[in-house]
Each structure stands twice: as structure tokens, then as C-alpha cells.
Design a protein with these regions (language model features):
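Extracellular glycan-modifying ectodomains
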Residues: 1-187
Length: 187
């Protein structure tokens, strides 16, 4: 009986990556595995964005516009509200070789260009320590890029810790960001 139920379910469900592509799951924003899986598919276009990716009721939304692979590819949406350019820079830098040579779409929102940048609490809601560590370990990323991103992360971590309702921040990440911003700090 269970085998029959599984067969019925599997025949009515779209393939995993096709069904997950239209959703902005936290695991795709703060993780790497699902992005790497999608990037490995020849018929998938990764779209990085912010809150505009959440308005799926609009006919021109990428998930609707390209539904059913009518343009010959599946879209995979990566982002949610407050995924500003810094979050995407970290995610793209952490992707290593998985995105090398791939076409991706990066939708930048107006809030990415405000002088004060992303608010510390919104940054922390989308920040991935794993992605940060992976980008630091990428020998192909320049020290200049690593230091710039580390400096920005260090600033945001300090500002976040000053918020009255801030959750605990991993002290190792704080020290690492400060050190990478200015490598001579701990030397």
C-alpha cells in the first residue's frame, strides 16, 4: 500500500528542483547546497533579488513569466526581503566554482543604494556565517574583496550588537571579520 501511495505522489509532483525553484526558501539564501545543485543544471537560470521576488501573484513575476520552462529553462529564485547587494555579494563570492561561467540575474533594489546601507538587524536576518567562511577560504578571491566584505560585515556586527533586542552573535565570526578587515590586527 505504501509503495502505491509513493508512486501516486511521485507521479503528481514536479521534479524537486523545478518545484523548489519558485520558492524563496531560507536554505537557499543562507546555504549553498541548493544553489550549487541548481547551478549544475543546464536548464536553470538563477535569479538573485530581494522583496520583489516575493510578489508571485503578479503575472510578470519571473516564476510566472517563465513557468513550465516555456523559454527552455527553469528559474530558481534566491532572495527575500532585505537581501540587499551585500548579502548577494557574500553569496556569490561563497559559491566558488559552482557559478563560474554560469549566467545569473541579479536584481538590485533601490534600498541597496541608500547611503547608510542595510540595517544591521536586516543584515543579520540573511547573513550566513558558512558563506562568509567559504568566501574567506576561496584562494581565487582577491584580498581586496575579502577585506572590503569583512570590513562591512565587522561594521554591521558591531552595530547589530548595539541594538537592544539583538540576539547573540558568534564571537568567532566577530573576531574573524575584524581580523580580515585589517589582517595585522591579530598578527
Amino acid at each position: 500500500v505504501l509503495g502505491g501511495t509513493a508512486a501516486v505522489l511521485s507521479s503528481t509532483m514536479p521534479p524537486f528542483r523545478d518545484s523548489v525553484g519558485d520558492h524563496n526558501d531560507t536554505e537557499k539564501i543562507t546555504g549553498e547546497y541548493l544553489v550549487e545543485l541548481s547551478a549544475a543544471q543546464d536548464d536553470t537560470l538563477l535569479i538573485f533579488g530581494s522583496s520583489e521576488l516575493c510578489t508571485t501573484y503578479i503575472p510578470t513575476h519571473p516564476a510566472n513569466f517563465f513557468a513550465g520552462k516555456r523559454a527552455g529553462f527553469q528559474v530558481d529564485l534566491i532572495g527575500r526581503g532585505s537581501c540587499q547587494s551585500l548579502i548577494h555579494a557574500i553569496e556569490l563570492a561563497a559559491s566558488g566554482d559552482s557559478l563560474r561561467g554560469e549566467k545569473v540575474v541579479l536584481i538590485t533594489s533601490p534600498q541597496s543604494f541608500v547611503p547608510e546601507g542595510i540595517a544591521p538587524d536586516l543584515f543579520m536576518a540573511n547573513f550566513s556565517a558558512q558563506q562568509y567562511l567559504d568566501l574567506l577560504n576561496d584562494p581565487e578571491l582577491s584580498d581586496e574583496v575579502k577585506q572590503y566584505l569583512s570590513g562591512r560585515i565587522a561594521e554591521l556586527l558591531v552595530a547589530y550588537r548595539e541594538l537592544p533586542d539583538a540576539a547573540e552573535v558568534d564571537p568567532a565570526i566577530q573576531v574573524l571579520a575584524a581580523h580580515e578587515q585589517s589582517p595585522s590586527l591579530l598578527s
